[in-house]
Amino acid sequence: MAKKLSKNQQKVRALFDANQAYDLHEAIELAKKTSYTKFDASVDLAFKLNLDVRKADQQLRGSVLLPKGTGKDVKVLVVTNNPEKQKLATEAKADFVLDAAAFEQKLKEDDYNFDVIVADPAMMPILGKYGKKLGPKGLMPNPKTGTVTPTPEKAVEELKKGKANYRTDKAGVVHSLIGKVSMPTESLVENAQTLISLIKKLKPAAVKGTYMQNLTVSSSMGPGIKIKLEK
């Protein structure tokens, strides 16, 4: 039996044709119009790619610096025992700069008042101990996203400017944030173009046939709006 749509969902469905693909600007406008949350919803792109995710070289994961930012004030925690790196991270406006002992104490207290952890590579043995806590929360640092780095201050600067992560799920779909509903459509379009260009460049050499099969944009809890794919 088909799931009954709520009144909000019915109103939203009336605003667009679920079977039609729109140009990028119009699709983003529709994603904003179909957002019915009371908070400033995120706007995300989802790429359905022709990938065999069982193969390591076809698992896309990384980060992209969005030219217009993410629209979000990201709280960054840096963990390092190096006094010079601590000083540089503080100057880069990291919200928390902790040594290993203070970091472990924070995790033991389940104090997660931050969004991202940036770690000095020397801290990885410490972080590994807390993988079961950090992993499910999406907080485990990773070299591919630039959050395990010998220059944490640079990572802090990029995160504060507007760095977004992307990764492939088990179905070969790559998801990434491009901003917030409150941002101007033109800014979201520019961010989307930057991300689309990057994903195209990352096409694995082994992929045959159509690489980008489908592309949608949506707000938090909103419907996916199809975007026309350039030939």
UniProtKB/Swiss-Prot annotation:
Query: Know the name of this protein?
Result: Large ribosomal subunit protein uL1
Q: Which domain of life is it from?
A: Bacteria
- Please give the family membership noted in the entry: Belongs to the universal ribosomal protein uL1 family.
Tell me which GO cellular component terms the UniProt record holds.
Answer: large ribosomal subunit
Question: Signal among the record's keywords?
Answer: no
Query: Which of UniProt's keywords are assigned here?
Result: Repressor, Ribonucleoprotein, Ribosomal protein, RNA-binding, rRNA-binding, Translation regulation, tRNA-binding
GO molecular function terms listed in the Swiss-Prot or TrEMBL record: rRNA binding; structural constituent of ribosome; tRNA binding
What CDD domains does the record point to?
Ribosomal_L1
Query: What quaternary structure, including any partners, is listed in this protein's UniProt entry?
Result: Part of the 50S ribosomal subunit.
Output the InterPro entries linked to this UniProt entry. Answer: Ribosom_uL1_bac-type, Ribosomal_uL1, Ribosomal_uL1-like, Ribosomal_uL1/biogenesis, Ribosomal_uL1_3-a/b-sand, Ribosomal_uL1_CS
Could you tell me which NCBIfam families the record lists for this protein? rplA_bact
| Function recorded in the entry | Binds directly to 23S rRNA. The L1 stalk is quite mobile in the ribosome, and is involved in E site tRNA release.
Q: Which GO terms describe its biological process?
A: regulation of translation; translation
